[in-house]
């Protein structure tokens, strides 16, 4: 017989305690620290904290938006599926347009990826929304382009696409964007849908 922890809440408590003991969270505000713990929990890498970049008002702004009923816009279904609905403060709508039937033709017309083309279907929902990009750098680049073109501004953007082509650059573009968007990013190549969903869940509710 194997001896291992079987109690779910106890596993969470021990995991979060380990993260707080091993990760250098001292330089983070309390609200960002809570989100960082969840992000680290999703990937198992305590050094992720070194690459987390954020605007000071990001977490508070995103929480206000969610409490007011703002939708959550996700680049891929994996991010949307990772959102724990019971944590949402206003039964917020979670939207992913990547599987919309119009997206393949739109991508061909625009000469871009489906992930980037799917952003075009966000336009009427972007104002004051909470955006989470966890997979496709092209989606994050296109989001920034749309804002530069005059599209409505979201309340906050979680930008954590993962990969070797464009991921680091897209997150740098968000973090350094002159529009001053409220954002949370993981600089460099690391990121992913699980980290994006973890950040959303931590922002949605202050309860661990």
PLM segments and residue spans:
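A short, well-structured juxtamembrane/interface segment
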Residues: 50-65
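C-terminal functional extensions of proteins
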Residues: 165-208
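N-terminal glycine-rich anion-binding loops that anchor highly charged ligand groups
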Residues: 27-41
């Amino acid at each position: 017989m194997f001896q291992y922890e079987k109690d779910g809440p106890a596993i969470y408590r021990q995991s979060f305690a380990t993260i707080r003991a091993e990760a250098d969270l001292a330089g983070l505000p309390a609200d960002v620290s809570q989100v960082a713990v969840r992000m680290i929990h999703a990937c198992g890498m305590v050094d992720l904290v070194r690459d987390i970049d954020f605007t000071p008002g990001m977490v508070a702004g995103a929480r206000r938006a969610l409490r007011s009923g703002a939708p959550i816009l996700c680049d891929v279904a994996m991010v949307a599926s990772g959102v724990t609905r019971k944590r949402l403060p206003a039964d917020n709508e979670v939207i992913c347009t990547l599987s919309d039937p119009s997206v393949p033709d739109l991508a061909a017309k625009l000469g871009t990826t489906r992930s980037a083309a799917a952003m075009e279907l966000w336009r009427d929902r972007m104002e004051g929304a909470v955006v989470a990009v966890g997979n496709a750098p092209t989606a994050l680049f296109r989001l920034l382009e749309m804002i530069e073109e005059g599209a409505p501004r979201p309340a906050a953007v979680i930008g954590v696409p993962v990969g070797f082509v464009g991921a680091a650059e897209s997150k740098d573009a968000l973090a350094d964007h002159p529009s001053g968007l409220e954002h949370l990013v993981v600089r460099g190549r690391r990121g992913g849908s699980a980290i994006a969903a973890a950040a959303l869940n931590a922002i949605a509710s202050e309860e661990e």
